[in-house]
Amino acid sequence: MSDERAPQRSTGPRKKRPFQRRKVCRFCADKQVTIDYKDPRTLRYFISERGKIIPRRISGNCAKHQREITEAIKRARNIALLPIAGSHAAQ
């Protein structure tokens, strides 16, 4: 049998990631802000330009409010307050 070893990772200097401040859920921080499917202006903040719902790790929402946001966006799409496709599809 041959004495081949799996390729090893380089042991060079590691790149340090810049420290990013942890995002805070805007709905937990300000209790007066509510999630409402009838308010498309608020919901558009959580939709990408292609029409996808922005994930929690990017938006900074907590799990509870991310679920509520997702449900509100889907309801708003269902009654045509928000487009199903992104804004680029209208062009």
UniProtKB/Swiss-Prot annotation:
Name of the encoding gene: rpsR
Function: Binds as a heterodimer with protein bS6 to the central domain of the 16S rRNA, where it helps stabilize the platform of the 30S subunit.
Oligomer status and interactors: Part of the 30S ribosomal subunit. Forms a tight heterodimer with protein bS6.
UniProt biased composition (Basic residues): 12-21
Family: Belongs to the bacterial ribosomal protein bS18 family.
GO MF annotation terms: small ribosomal subunit rRNA binding; structural constituent of ribosome
Superkingdom, taxonomy of origin: Bacteria
UniProt source species: Geotalea daltonii (strain DSM 22248 / JCM 15807 / FRC-32) (Geobacter daltonii)
Keyword terms of this UniProt record: Ribonucleoprotein, Ribosomal protein, RNA-binding, rRNA-binding
PROSITE patterns xrefs: RIBOSOMAL_S18
Protein name per its UniProtKB record: Small ribosomal subunit protein bS18
Protein's GO biological process: translation
Pfam family, one: Ribosomal_S18
GO cellular component: cytosolic small ribosomal subunit
Region (Disordered): 1-21
